[in-house]
């Protein structure tokens, strides 16, 4: 049976990366929340 998670570095960055988050208003809100929460890693 096919495993559902087949990691790709490029896809991970493109979908969940910092620049992707910064490119939309809601993405910036995600970063803001994670900063507020005190996450050491903001994005993938």
From Swiss-Prot:
GO terms for biological process: translation. The keyword Repeat does not apply. Keywords: Ribonucleoprotein, Ribosomal protein. InterPro entries: Ribosomal_bL34 (IPR000271). One of its GO terms (molecular function) is structural constituent of ribosome. It holds the Pfam family Ribosomal_L34. The keyword rRNA-binding does not apply. Residues 1-23, 30-44 have a biased composition (Basic residues). Residues 1-44 are annotated as: Disordered. GO terms for cellular component: ribonucleoprotein complex; ribosome. Belongs to the bacterial ribosomal protein bL34 family. PANTHER family: LARGE RIBOSOMAL SUBUNIT PROTEIN BL34M, MITOCHONDRIAL RIBOSOMAL PROTEIN 34 FAMILY MEMBER. HAMAP family: Ribosomal_bL34. This is Large ribosomal subunit protein bL34. It comes from Thermoanaerobacter pseudethanolicus (strain ATCC 33223 / 39E) (Clostridium thermohydrosulfuricum). The gene is rpmH.
């Amino acid at each position: 049976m096919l495993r559902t998670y087949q990691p790709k570095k490029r896809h991970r960055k493109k979908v969940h990366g910092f620049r992707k988050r910064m490119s939309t208003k809601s993405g910036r809100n995600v970063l803001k929340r994670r900063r507020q929460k005190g996450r050491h890693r903001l994005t993938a």
